[in-house]
Every structure is written in structure tokens, then in C-alpha cells.
Amino acid sequence: MAKETFNRSKPHLNIGTIGHVDHGKTTLTAAITKVLSDAGYCQAKSFDQIDNAPEEKERGITINTSHVEYETANRHYAHVDCPGHADYVKNMVTGAAQMDGAILVVAATDGPMPQTREHILLGRQVGIPRMVVFMNKVDMVDDEELLELVEMEIRDLLSFYEYDGDNGPVVQGSALGGLNNDPAWVPKIIELMEACDSWIQEPIRDTEKPFLMPVEDVFTITGRGTVATGRIETGICNTGDPVEIIGMGAEKLTSTVTGIEMFRQILDRGEAGDNAGILLRGVAKEDIKRGMVIIKPGSVKPHAKFKAEVYILKKEEGGRHTPFHNNYRPQFYVRTTDVTGVIMLPTGVEMVMPGDNLTIDVTLLSPIAMSVGLRFAIREGGRTVGAGQVTEITE
């Protein structure tokens, strides 16, 4: 009996494989597509197809990423796999692939390694809510006690970084065995996907969050008033809704939406993802400028001080050729505009080299609307020298 064709009615989640180099992330990705394609849920992708990751540009940074999609009985997944460690760091920090959950791959032969730890920490910093563990290469370890020890070590590490190490699923298997259709290991791949289905939660969709639209442009329509255009980032906006306009150092403005224009038609509502023009009552064109945001009243506040997890580009990536020191003052490109900010380095860090990834303190010269998870590029003279996201608002 043929399985039904792909349908969009299943909930969609973004996940990815993370973990130390050579622990089997790409092999596992290939095994998942193989086992699920045998069940009729997707097309299988070979190791080489996944490993040969195309280059992508995200916020001015080149990243190699492979995208694979597959379905389980309950969900549709978009899965990212990166060939190199630097690609993972860049991917997670820039949010090129926003992950709703991750599969942490740890080889039973090695146990947790430095990049295992680093990826868990990054996941915590960039807000990956939950992780499922796949202990790989279990077929190469014949000591049950050793397997138990490795599992305990992984659970402790997850707990250390504030994940639920005690209750999170750990599946012991062999990615290569699953890929090669070995009857001992195929069920473990199925078990892993069931664990993803049950443990990784569906994210709150953008349309369910409060309304927010960054302003890209402003103009006047004679007889109608002021229109601000942009792409609605989150939420839904209806005609008649009260809104606030904040950011760029200006006093908070309040207004009412008198219409929403899309494709040269006036509509009653706009939602996340729409490019729209919002007609605002009683607001002069001079009062709004690019870089401000229009929001549901009270949902976001402007802030100027925050902590952030950042990746600084290497020279070969078009970044700086030299390190920078404390009190470095680049521009922070947030949503639609540049704001100058001052970077304070962590205690004990003298300078930051191109290619580094670290946590910094930033003070912007003018406050902008922000919440934890907000992404930005760091620019200098119009070129991107780094990227990051807000991990904590300090003032």
C-alpha cells in the first residue's frame, strides 16, 4: 500500500544534529532519512549528499549547512547538519538555522568531548529548549558498565548546562548499523525519532507572539495619513488595534491602526511574514523613522545594555584582520538599522581574535526594542565583522 503524499497538516519543527567531530552526526542524519524512507515518509539522502554542504550567506557570514527534510508519523522535520565545528558555531550564533530542538550525538567509544560541551553550552546560550541524546557506535563497545558510565556522564553534562539531564531521552544505537539496514540497529533509529516526537516540544509559532514590525520606510498618503512599511516579524495586526512605536531614542508614541496595505490593497489584518504598510492615526511622518518598531502596547521595551553570545569573523570570511580590545565601538545592525555600541570584554579577556566565539557586554548609544534571543550583526564601516544574539538584558 502506497503511503499518502506529503501533507502540510503535520506540525513542522526545525531540528539538527550537534556534537563532537567524527562522532557520527552526518551518518546519523543519513540513517534517519534511510530508515524513514523505508517506512515511506521521506526520500533517503546519502552520507555524501549531506556531507557536501552548500555554502550559504546569513547576515554577511558564509556558512556550510546541509538541509534535509523528513517526516515521522506525527511531524514534519527540517533538519540541519553542518560539516565543520566552526559552521556549527556560526550557525547557532547567527540563527541561520533556528532550532526548536537538537539531537546531541555522542560516540560511546569516546564519551563527551570538548565540542560536545561547547555545543551544549551554545545550545543553552541561543535558546535551544530541549535535546535528545543519541549515543552512537554502541556496537563497538562490549562493556555494559562502560556504556552506563558514558550515559551518566552525558546526563551530568546536560544538567550542568541546565538541561533536564535526569529525564531527557538517551537512545543507544549505531548510526552506521541503521544506515546499513542492520536489523539490530534500525529499531534504535525509530526509537530516536519517537523520542524526538515526544520530548522536543512544538515551538510557539510567530503568529501567536505579540505583534511587532520593524519600520523600513515611512511615507504619507494624502488624505489617509502616515504609512510605515516593513515585514511583520511576529504576531497579527488588525485594523483598529492600538499600537506603540518605540526605539531609536525617541519617546514612545501611541497610535491606532487605521488600515493595513498589502499588494496595493487595503486589508483588515496582517500577520507574521507579511510585507505590509500600516496606516497610523495621528502620527506625523517626521515622528517615525527606519529602525523603530511598531508593537502591541507594552509587549517590548527599549533597552541599551545587554549580554550577548557572538561570533567574530575570520579574516578569510571578510572579517577584521586584527584583534579588538575592550571598549571597541562598532555598529550593531539590528532588524533594519545600525546603532553604535560599546563592547566590554569578560574579565580576564584582553582581546578578541578573528574567529573567536564569546560572551560580551554591550552598551548601545541609543536604546532599541529588544528581548532575549534578538539577533544582530556587528559591522564596521559597512562590512560585517561578527554576529550574535542577546542572551540577557542587563538594563
From Swiss-Prot:
Region (G2): 60-64
Entry binding sites for Mg(2+): 26
Residues that hold GTP according to the record: 19-26, 81-85, 136-139
Residue ranges occupied by any tr-type G domain in the UniProt entry: 10-204
Residue ranges of the region described as G1: 19-26
Protein localization: Cytoplasm
This protein's GO CC annotations: cytosol
Region G3: start-end pairs: 81-84
Catalysed reaction, written as an equation: GTP + H2O = GDP + phosphate + H(+)
Protein family: Belongs to the TRAFAC class translation factor GTPase superfamily. Classic translation factor GTPase family. EF-Tu/EF-1A subfamily.
Protein name stated in the entry: Elongation factor Tu
